[in-house]
């Protein structure tokens, strides 16, 4: 089969399109003939060596296709099943071998392309909106980078759960995307101090939760915008890592909560994964969730 391989860390130039051995499943594994793959920022981290992985490797952690072979003891899937997955290396190929328990079934009304485009980011948005801080009607949420892959899905899920959404973006085009996803208010942080604008929009009351994937440049102001007992959900650092936080600061700002979650810890069991992926794929299939 053909695959894109990485033999040394570096930029896009280290990606090598080459022949690779056909995968053979071991016990508990399944081979998936891939029809679509998802591209994610984490792929660049693997390629550049920011997240250590053994080399050589086939990058890519998200894909969808059809099961073509199974190893001994596999009961979760069978040959011919349409499946998707997120979180296992090896997607930049015509086929990949994956632990069968990490595969999720695709509904008939969801294409492989749609599944590969939504599983990783969709499950991330799902755990943020239902796990890290379970949004409810009456909540006000501040969502940074609201026009990004996770951001657009998170805005939609927040609205499904009845929250008021204040979104930050950087450009006119992204403002339109965030509004199209349902954001109630959109703040252009390049033109406006988002802290002052959120204070104005909330009559200085603040918000129940901040979802922050930006990190260094937004974190401190986000803490200032939380209501007493509010929650800061820091799930990324596109502007750089956040400095160490003195726990006393959380008390001083109103007994607020801080969490730094990852998808891995919200899909530890097959039941967790089937629940999150199942809801996301159902929303895609029924048109409740728009995937770009």
Locate the predicted segments by residue.
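Glycine-rich beta-strand-centered segment in the early N-terminal region that forms part
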Residues: 21-38, 48-90
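NAD(P)H dinucleotide-binding glycine-rich loop of Rossmann-like/cofactor-binding domains
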Residues: 36, 45, 84-147
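Short glycine-centered segments of the SAM/dcSAM-binding site in methyltransferase folds
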Residues: 82, 140, 164, 230-231, ...
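Short, glycine/polar-rich helix-capping loops at beta-to-alpha or helix-loop-helix junctions
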Residues: 91-94, 169-177, 242-247
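Hydrophobic/small residue at the entry helix of a nucleotide-binding pocket
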Residues: 150
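Adenosine-nucleotide cofactor-binding segment
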Residues: 159-218, 269-272
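Glycine-rich phosphate-binding loop and adjacent beta-alpha segment
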Residues: 169, 217-289
């Amino acid at each position: 089969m053909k695959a894109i391989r990485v033999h040394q860390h570096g930029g896009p130039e280290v990606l090598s399109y080459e022949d690779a051995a056909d995968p053979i499943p071991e016990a508990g594994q399944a081979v998936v003939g891939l029809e679509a793959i998802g591209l994610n920022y984490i792929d660049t981290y693997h390629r550049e060596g920011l997240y250590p992985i053994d080399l050589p490797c086939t990058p890519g952690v998200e894909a969808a296709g059809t099961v073509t072979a199974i190893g001994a003891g596999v009961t979760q899937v069978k040959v011919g099943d349409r499946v998707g997955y997120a979180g296992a290396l090896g997607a930049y190929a015509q086929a990949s071998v994956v632990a069968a328990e990490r595969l999720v079934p695709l509904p008939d009304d969801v294409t492989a392309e749609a599944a590969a485009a939504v599983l990783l980011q969709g499950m991330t948005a799902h755990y943020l909106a239902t796990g890290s801080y379970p949004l409810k009607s009456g909540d006000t949420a501040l969502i940074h980078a609201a026009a990004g892959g996770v951001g657009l899905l998170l805005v939609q899920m927040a609205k499904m759960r009845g929250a008021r959404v204040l979104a930050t973006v950087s450009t006119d085009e992204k403002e339109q995307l965030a509004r199209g996803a349902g954001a109630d208010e959109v703040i252009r942080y390049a033109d406006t101090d988002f802290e002052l604008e959120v204070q104005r929009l909330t009559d200085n009351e603040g918000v129940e939760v901040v979802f922050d994937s930006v990190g260094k440049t937004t974190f401190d102001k986000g803490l200032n915008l939380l209501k007493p007992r509010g929650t800061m959900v820091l799930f990324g650092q596109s502007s750089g890592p956040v400095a160490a936080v003195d726990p006393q600061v959380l008390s001083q700002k109103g007994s607020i909560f801080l969490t730094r979650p990852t998808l891995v810890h919200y899909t530890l069991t097959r039941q967790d994964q089937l629940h999150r992926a199942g809801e996301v794929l159902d929303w895609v299939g029924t048109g409740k969730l728009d995937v770009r």
